[in-house]
Amino acid sequence: MINRQLSRLLLCSILGSTTLISGCALVRKDSAPHQQLKPEQIKLADDIHLASSGWPQAQWWKQLNDPQLDALIQRTLSGSHTLAEAKLREEKAQSQADLLDAGSQLQVAALGMLNRQRVSANGFLSPYAMDAPALGMDGPYYTEATVGLFAGLDLDLWGVHRSAVAAAIGAHNAALAETAAVELSLTTGVAQLYYSMQASYQMLDLLEQTRDVIDYAVKAHQSKVAHGLEAQVPFHGARAQILAVDKQIAAVKGQITETRESLRALIGAGASDMPEIKPVALPRVQTGIPATLSYELLARRPDLQAMRWYVQASLDQVDSARALFYPSFDIKAFFGLDAIHLDTLFKKTSRQFNFIPGLKLPLFDGGRLNANLEGTRAASNMMIERYNQSVLNAVRDVAVNGTRLQTLNDEREMQAEHVEATRFTQRAAEAAYQRGLTSRLQATEARLPVLAEEMSLLMLDSRRVIQSIQLMKSLGGGYQAAPVVEKK
């Protein structure tokens, strides 16, 4: 008898195993994931010779030793609505990961139900429609009551939920990196606007000096005309020059106002609480390019880190889609009390226990699972291609910004020599005036070429500062990949 039972059990096991193996839906088509760019492909061209330096440091702006800029950036990071939105996206991604993780855990709920019913005399329970107390039936009306605990657990043997949770955690890590990217964009944006305003202040000072020189020339020519010493042509020429300078002054003042308003919006200041920005000298440009990029660029660019995590999340989603082809197992259980009469509900004899193991085999689904897998794989490959292009774009940013800064540095050296040459001419004119060889007007007007060349030098210095900040941004701005958020 025992041998017969063992034989039956063995036969059932063999049939069950065969069913599990053959009962799964078939994966008709699944391509391999696309390849990601290799680190050795992340390098600059050999003809980019900007001075080598280390990677930018965290809070890079503090190295500029400008308290005004420090205060502006601190206010931006504490009051930016854009940054607040990014942090809310972090919270949303975290809550989504928690939600998916909770769905894979043991679920327990208290259950209470009251069902007042009239049993049909012609239905399956027709005997209970009789009013026969001797037989234990007092129909047709009954009040069924049920109280107890209901529990359910998805065993997730193939990792459907586990991979979905991993994908959600990857999306959360991507959101963390995106927040860092927003911070980098805000800090560099504030610094660029701030130094653009400082350059405008210095340009305004040079234009006002130019106007003073031309104003002196206007008065000198006017005096000569009044005394009949020269024609009116030089006088009107000087007047035209001063009007042109006035036009430039008005334009620069407009630029200062526009830059201030752009800065106000970026730092989140209101109409009456915008801090006063006092003129300061432009900082020295010291940004260079690291000796090598490779893995470091991937780890130091927050946007690339975000893309990398999105790629990983997409691969986890593919794993989840593949796991749907396999059988799923779950267990449900109930323990409580059930009675068709309220007065007997809490008696010992009303106890009820249900243990319900479940198995679901995907046999025929009309191609739904394959379509889902194919679409998920395509989305993952799209993300990989987007990541690859982002890496190439990041290398391009470093190369282009480094080349531009290198060119500006070369132009600045030549322009500085040009300024020095015009200053020599001015000093010669002043010396000639001191010896009585030229007029004071000629000595004063010799200052104009110097001011013009100093303006050109200022424009180059301004562009160099802005470009160095842009290069620093393309190198990650001191960002380093944060510790990975993992499932606890």
From Swiss-Prot:
PROSITE patterns: PROKAR_LIPOPROTEIN. Could be involved in resistance to puromycin, acriflavine and tetraphenylarsonium chloride. This is Multidrug resistance outer membrane protein MdtP. One of its GO terms (cellular component) is cell outer membrane. Coiled coil: none annotated. PANTHER family: MULTIDRUG RESISTANCE OUTER MEMBRANE PROTEIN MDTP-RELATED, OUTER MEMBRANE CATION EFFLUX PROTEIN. It comes from the Bacteria. It comes from Shigella flexneri. SUPFAM superfamilies: Outer membrane efflux proteins (OEP) (SSF56954). Could be part of a tripartite efflux system composed of MdtN, MdtO and MdtP.
